[in-house]
Amino acid sequence: MAFDGADSWAHPELFQFDEECLPKAVAGCPPDAFSATGQLWGNPLYDWGYHKKDHYSWWIKRMEYSLKLYDVVRVDHFRGFEAYYSIPYGDPTAEFGHWEKGPGLDLFARLKKSLKKEELPIIAEDLGFLTPEVHEMLKESGFPGMKVLEFAFDDSENSDYLPHKYQENCIVYTGTHDNETLVGWYENMNRRNKSFAREYMGCRHTPKKEMHWEFIRLAMASPAKLAVIPVQDYLGLGAEARINEPSTLGKNWKWRLLPGEITGDVLKQCRRMAKLYGRLPETVSDINM
């Protein structure tokens, strides 16, 4: 929730604010592979003690309305429900924060009960710094986590993001809004990782301009229950089509899909792969294209 958002203004009791409605601390994440100084998001932190006392009524209303709009809700920063990173308000970077305990699965148990659902249609965004406690919370929740294919080829050749290590109860993405497009990412890979990726996929002789389709194929062929492919990757677009670069300002969230960019040939290839790997809905599987 943004500091200047409607809920922050209307319901300051939901957040860790002082008497003047200024944040006592703000959200972010510690230094990692994305940023040497961490990510300073600046969002106010929830007052979980208040939310629990109020039986999570704000969360129930929020989820209830979201499920009127969407079939599935991706819960961002799922690890924050186990423990969240608290950064002193006014700090210029996220380097000097600390971890505090979140509500755990108590929130989701209350959501299930209040919304009268045996299973909540939730995808848990479980990326970033994960502890054994976070892994255990995800397992106990039953929610599918996320696998990002671009994380699989990272010099180790033993990454947990390699598709042969996936369980069915996960969602595979070629990349998210925080990643480079497949084309931009492959362009910046070192020779060793490119060689390993080609060997892993059995495509040593695939032309460079077709490599994005090999990674899409890898995601489609994985055991993951759902494969999510950004449209930029289907179109084979480069760094100019990246959505967001963490810890930067000015150029993010500006890319737009223009009319006519998705051609008939691209649609045919999308359908062919989806059908080949059993990911085409039955209602359209026999439609000629």
Kindly label every feature range from the protein language model:
Residues 2-228, 232-234, 239, 245-260:
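Alpha-amylase-like alpha-glycosidases and glucanotransferases acting on alpha-linked glucans and related
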Residues 236-289:
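In a subset of proteins, long, contiguous C-terminal domains/tails are tracked
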